[in-house]
Swiss-Prot record:
Organism: Salmonella gallinarum (strain 287/91 / NCTC 13346)
NCBIfam families referenced in this protein's UniProt entry, alphabetically: PRK09489.1
Location in the cell: Cytoplasm
Assembly and interaction partners: Monomer.
Top EC class for this record: transferase
Keywords: Cytoplasm, Methyltransferase, rRNA processing, S-adenosyl-L-methionine, Transferase
Species lineage: Bacteria, Pseudomonadati, Pseudomonadota, Gammaproteobacteria, Enterobacterales
EC number: 2.1.1.172
Disulfide bonds, paired cysteine numbers: none
Listed name of the protein: Ribosomal RNA small subunit methyltransferase C
PANTHER family reported for this sequence: RIBOSOMAL RNA SMALL SUBUNIT METHYLTRANSFERASE C
InterPro entries hit by this protein: DNA_methylase_N6_adenine_CS, Mtase_sm_N, rRNA_ssu_MeTfrase_C, RsmC/RlmG, SAM-dependent_MTases_sf, Small_mtfrase_dom
SUPFAM superfamilies registered for this protein in UniProt: S-adenosyl-L-methionine-dependent methyltransferases (SSF53335)
Pfam families in UniProt: MTS (PF05175), MTS_N (PF08468)
Length: 342
């Protein structure tokens, strides 16, 4: 997070205007500008654990990771700077939550890349904080308004669910494949055989669909689920509860908070971080799996066929095999042996 994103560079063009502001930064915080911005005071709220990890080193208790912001997160703030994510329902969830806590009259700034759909901020906030575009640069837009009316926010109304093979999948805005099972996960699920046993770690668990499906036909598995996303963590907990299943669920930046070893690690790893393409999480997953697999333990992941995971798997484990594939996706399997690079 050392280099500033285009959105942050647009904000820096107006840095003189914020010298006396007490700012809450929120949204898709892809760099450490909230910690370095020159202003009277700054706080940050994020739903992304890896963003919190970076910012907390510099901001301490002035940055919080959670599903929803609380009144203490906005205390004394007179300005909101919101970084627009690529997911519109996620933006609505976060903005309605935060603005419901802020007093009328606060300044509201929304910044984001044009390709992310930041223009949607204008109609979204029209009834609460009418926005005007104040800058356009680096293929980004910067919008400003003042909060005229607090929105009503209800976390309960944000929940959605769908069903797969008799399982209820609970989900929230910002969770991967919120509207139904994605093709990649479906392919990975097709390879999970009944009566699997042992300790299974689901990395990047999303709404918990992989773990729920596995546990439904393999009741002897012991599940551990983790994700960087606060909505995903809460959705996975709700999915397990809705289906009478048990498992430990927590926030983790891949393996950062994971303890111990497992008999199987499963994942549909992301290759985007916000709007940016990034293979960091998948590479960390593959290379770090050797420290979290028992001898003979298995790593099984699904990925877009064009991604360069076979090379990383072979470098780390010495081999891999493709156990299922379509035109777009492949399911890779490898096993912890003596030749794996620990």
């Amino acid at each position: 997070m050392s280099a500033f994103t285009p959105a942050s560079e647009v904000l820096l063009r107006h840095s003189d205007d914020f010298e006396q502001s007490r700012i809450l930064f929120a949204g898709d915080l892809q760099d450490d500008l909230p910690a370095r911005f020159e202003c009277a005071a700054s706080r940050a709220h994020t739903q992304q654990f890896h963003h919190w990890q970076v910012l907390s080193r510099q901001m301490g208790d002035n940055v919080r990771f959670s599903l929803v912001a609380q009144a203490s997160d906005v205390a004394d703030c007179d300005t909101l700077i919101y970084y627009w994510p690529k997911n519109k329902p996620e933006a609505q969830f976060q903005l309605m939550n935060i603005l419901s806590l802020m007093p009328s009259g606060v300044d509201v700034f929304v910044v984001g890349e044009n390709r992310s759909g930041v223009r949607s901020a204008e109609p979204m906030l029209a009834d609460y904080a009418p926005l005007n575009k104040v800058d356009s640069a680096r293929r980004c837009g910067l919008y400003h308004g003042r909060l005229e009316k607090q929105p009503q926010f209800s976390l309960e109304s944000c929940w959605a669910e769908y069903n797969i093979d008799g399982l209820t999948i609970k989900t929230l805005p910002g969770v991967f494949s919120r509207d139904g099972l994605d093709v990649g996960s479906q392919l990975l699920l097709s390879t999970l055989t009944p009566h699997t046993k042992g300790k299974v770690l689901d990395v990047g668990c999303g709404a918990g669909v992989l773990s729920a499906a596995l546990a439904s036909h393999s009741p002897k598995v012991r599940l551990t689920l983790c994700d960087v996303s606060a909505p995903a963590v809460e959705a996975s907990r709700a999915t397990l509860a809705a289906n009478g299943l048990e498992g430990e669920v927590f926030a983790s930046n891949v393996f950062s908070e994971v303890k111990g070893r497992f008999d199987m690690i499963i994942s549909n790893p992301p290759f985007h971080d916000g709007m940016q393409t990034s293979l960091d999480a998948a590479q960390t997953l593959i290379r770090g799996a050797v420290r979290h697999l028992n001898s003979g333990g298995e790593l099984r992941i699904v990925a877009n066929a064009f991604l360069p995971y076979p090379k990383i798997l072979d470098e780390t484990f010495g081999f891999h095999e493709v156990i299922a594939q379509t035109g777009r996706f492949k399911v890779y399997r490898t096993v912890m042996t003596r030749q794996a690079k620990k």
